[in-house]
Amino acid sequence: MTEPSEMVSVRYMVDDVEKAVAFYTSFLDFKVLTSFAPAFADVARGNLRLLLSGPTSSAGRPMPDGTKPRPGGWNRIHLIVDDIDAEVSRLRDAGAPFRNDILEGPGGKQILLQDPSGNVVELFQPAAAPVR
């Protein structure tokens, strides 16, 4: 293996690379690194690189058993936000589609939104550290 870098990469299968790029750049402040649409593009936010692979990309080719990679599911990237209520309000006003409402647990608050292909993005606001 190569040495780890500062950048972390995650691949998402998408139905439409251009729609996916528009979603991540418009709603979540990612920046385009490269685009070979309609097959592939990659976008970045901080040290997260998201590889967006369409049906015509090499990552979209069927496996030897015939299984085709598909978008969607429940695996997701997890983005930390400072004020989840304000972020959700901003995104709802902009038309971002959410799967649920804000949930709160001992670790903090979270909500799920989805990109145009159904891939999930989790927004998470950590709980305040307990006072000792």
Predicted regions and their residues:
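Vicinal oxygen chelate
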Residues: 1-9, 31-80, 88-114, 125-132
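Catalytic core of Fe(II)/2-oxoglutarate
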Residues: 13
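Conserved active-site tyrosine of GNAT-family acetyltransferases
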Residues: 20-25, 91, 118
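Short glycine-/small-residue motifs
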Residues: 120-123
